[in-house]
Amino acid sequence: IQGLLSEFDCQIILTAGPGESEKAHELAAKIDSQNVVVYDKNKGLVDFAHSLACADLFIAGSTGPLHLSSAFNVPTIGFYPNSQSSQPRRWKPINDADKHLAFCPPKGKDEMNLGLISIDDALIEIVPFVRKMWQAGN
């Protein structure tokens, strides 16, 4: 998040479902930026889907909201485990292929640990991807 805020004048919206609100607010407080807000009071799936459809970009793990965003052809950045059954090759979203960027941890015994993905290395790809998406106007 801090990497994106240092490169772009943008709003970051942290979404939180049931039971996730406290963690989202803790993260927002840790970042301490007026450009970061928490959206945790939606009125269900339809309301949440409307917010995703309005997004300029959606970043998440390989979860339902990532795939729902892609159904609106919103540019997506996904973080996936590196096991054969979980890789982006199998679970890539359905948005246009040039509108998705995927990251996995290194192969090995900790291939399910998304914390092993280097954010600094990922930003090397993320920043130009975001720039390209926003210049193209999605």
Which residues make up each language-model segment?
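Donor-binding and catalytic core of enzymes assembling or modifying cell-surface/extracellular glycoconjugates
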Residues: 1-77, 81
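Mid-sequence helix-capping/hinge segment at a functional interface
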Residues: 22, 133-138
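Nucleotide-sugar donor-binding patch of glycosyltransferase catalytic domains
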Residues: 38, 67-135
